[in-house]
Amino acid sequence: MLSYFYRELCMSVIELTQSNFDETITNNEIVIIDFWAPWCGPCLQFAPTFKETSEKVEGVTFTKINTEEEQALGAHFRIRSIPTLMIFREGIGIFSQPGSLSGKDLEDLLEKAKTINMDEVKKEVENQ
């Protein structure tokens, strides 16, 4: 019942799977991912905040990954705690943090993600 509630609440949020992950990350400039599970109380509590923010913030693709159904993606990103938020910009991971945020903090974080100098980020990635 709670996972149904979560799914209904996040209708405007794209559900990522192994089959659409690469395409979604590649075809959208900024993508935020909410790693969650249907049994996770804090994940279910965060769902309304995530959805409300998705309706306010423009230029960001809001997505979620059910770590129970997409265990390979959770393992690939070494998700150890949920919820975990991750942001990609221009296909590069620029933020990852376990835990949820308030709506205001989430909006501020996404606005900051829009202003990051990606030329500098790409240089850092090349030097690794």
Model regions: which residues?
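Non-catalytic, surface beta->alpha helical segment in thiol-disulfide oxidoreductase systems
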Residues: R89-E120
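Short acidic DE-rich linear segments
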Residues: D119-Q128
